[in-house]
Amino acid sequence: VGVVAGTLNTLVGGGTLLVLPLLVSLGIDPLVANGTNRICVAFQALVAGWTMNRGLERSRGSKAQEMPTIGWRPLMLVGGAAILGALAAIEIEHLDKALFRQVMGWLLLVAVGAFLWPRPDPPLADPLTDPLAATPGIKFYIGGLICGFYGGFIGAGVGALIVLLLTTSMRLPVVEAVRWKVWWVVAMSTASGFLYLSQDVFDRAVAIPLIPSYGLGAYLG
């Protein structure tokens, strides 16, 4: 399951929709399962980012960096929002465990529906002829905050949301959006993962097999 989830996370997102319900069904506390998964996803996304960048360098050589880009500053935005999302998850679970289970369940259902809902192909733009196409606007930053918060809170299907944001608000090609999606997931999962670790919301017995299987899936993806 970890290999399949890692591959899905790399290509389109949604691997957490497989892993998180499985961990909860095995009797692991939902918050612990969520925190453990966030930490494992950070490692998976790092492997995916390294693999994608290496592939771009091999296929395009020195032109790999000439693709349309959104810059690295939004990573700080989604990372900070992810910390807030993780804090919200921890606080809700501490206040009412049953409420957190209900919120997680409904979010997973919504994420599955959104993941399967057909979406039309967004119009693409050439950033060389249309400078505004690759210029972040207010909708982009609001969307980034929402993605970051949700990524730290649960994160199921957040990769697909990020790709949707980048292809609509920035009008990036899907391939380029997927590449940037990976680094957004690295930022939000690493930031929220450190918080979960600091609060001891982490199961080492689960992470030991999950991290390498996630990494293998990311490499294959």
Task: Enumerate the language-model features and the residues they cover.
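Juxtamembrane transmembrane-helix boundary motif
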Residues: 1-8, 14-30, 51-154, 161-169, ...
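Residues at secondary-structure transition points
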Residues: 13-14, 37, 104, 181
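Small-residue hotspots at the loop-to-helix junctions and early N-terminal turns
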Residues: 30-38, 178-182
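Transmembrane alpha-helices of multi-pass small-molecule transport proteins
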Residues: 36-54
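Transmembrane alpha-helical segments of major facilitator superfamily
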Residues: 40, 180-184, 209-210, 214
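Membrane-embedded alpha-helical transmembrane segments of multi-pass integral membrane proteins
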Residues: 44-47, 111-114, 188-191
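Hydrophobic alpha-helical transmembrane segments of multi-pass integral membrane proteins
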Residues: 176-192
